[in-house]
Amino acid sequence: GWKDWLKKGKEWLKAKGPGIVKAALQAATQ
C-alpha cells in the first residue's frame, strides 16, 4: 500500500538526501 511506499521513501531520503543536497549545491555554484 501507499504507507509502505511512504516508508520506503523516507528510508531512501535518509540514505540519499545528503548526497542529493550536496549535488544540488554544487550545480548551483557552477
From Swiss-Prot:
User: The organism sits in which domain of life?
Assistant: Eukaryota
Checking InterPro entries in the record gives: Poneritoxin
* Keywords in alphabetical order: Antibiotic, Antimicrobial, Fungicide, Secreted, Toxin
Which is an annotated Pfam family here?
Ponericin
Q: Gene Ontology cellular component?
A: extracellular region
Listed GO molecular functions? toxin activity
Q: Its Gene Ontology biological processes?
A: defense response to bacterium; defense response to fungus; killing of cells of another organism
Localized where?
A: Secreted
Keyword Membrane in record? no
Q: Report, as the record phrases it, the tissue specificity of this protein.
A: Expressed by the venom gland.
| Principal location | secreted
Entry similarity comment: Belongs to the ponericin-G family.
Instruction: Give the protein's biological function.
Output: Shows a broad spectrum of activity against both Gram-positive and Gram-negative bacteria. Also has antimicrobial activity against S.cerevisiae. Has insecticidal and non-hemolytic activity.
The protein, known as:
U1-poneritoxin-Ng3b
The protein's organism comes out as: Neoponera goeldii
